[in-house]
Amino acid sequence: MLVLTRKQNESIMIGDDIEITVVGTEGDKVRLGIKAPKDVEIHRAEVYQKIQEENVKASQVSENVLDKLSDALQKKNK
């Protein structure tokens, strides 16, 4: 992990098109501003983790559900 020290209103660049700026600090909290192209998704780590967990759950459709759906479609087409 690269660790950088920045003061308020100082930035770092990631590639050519992502800029992260220290907007402010309050106690142990740091406020960051992020400029990035609209096609780049930006999430807090805990939100990103939750999205990944939900995607895994959604992709695990049981075979039983698929069998029931297949049966229903076959009955409909008769």
From Swiss-Prot:
The gene is csrA. Pfam families: CsrA (PF02599). The keyword Cell membrane does not apply. Belongs to the CsrA/RsmA family. It is found in: Cytoplasm. InterPro entries: CsrA, CsrA_sf. The keyword RNA-binding applies. Homodimer; the beta-strands of each monomer intercalate to form a hydrophobic core, while the alpha-helices form wings that extend away from the core. A translational regulator that binds mRNA to regulate translation initiation and/or mRNA stability. Usually binds in the 5'-UTR at or near the Shine-Dalgarno sequence preventing ribosome-binding, thus repressing translation. Its main target seems to be the major flagellin gene, while its function is anatagonized by FliW. This is Translational regulator CsrA. Its main location: cytoplasm. GO terms for molecular function: mRNA 5'-UTR binding. NCBIfam families: csrA, PRK01712.1. One of its GO terms (biological process) is bacterial-type flagellum organization. One of its GO terms (cellular component) is cytosol. Keywords: Bacterial flagellum biogenesis, Cytoplasm, Repressor, RNA-binding, Translation regulation.
